[in-house]
């Protein structure tokens, strides 16, 4: 199970960001592995994504470890259900930025909306890295890489906004992100949760480190 833990720091994002990276061992255990750390430009929190095999252990981390190490003002958790990871096209542009796309939909149409996201034909300058159900403030969360916000908006307007059941789509720029899981583990993790990978023979799982605002181009 994947869980996003949103951490709202008291002492500023920069200090808390560094504290997370310096204390990853204290923020994890045998059942809860930190995968990725990210920060959305418009928000006053950062997000630490975990792979969780025991939800009770994550509860201990959230109520014990995170407060003792990071001293946040508050935390919020979002469970990512049925996550799907996408490989990246080989002919992608180099200067990509990462955006979180949050979709609110009608309950009876969510499966069709989710499948629409999975099976769209994506161009090389707008494509997802993951999609999952979240069922919180939003119903579906996906991360996309693109050359600009305008390009993401244009693509979603043409290909998703008119989908039956879509109520709202919000786009947020991810200005900072870092993979904290070991590279080989993260690659295996993504591949094991990529049921679509056989449809993308021209894609790969290698991502350049030069992507602006999208370090390692993951999640």
Predicted regions and their residues:
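A compositional/biophysical signature of low hydrophobicity enriched in polar/charged and small residues
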Residues: 1-219
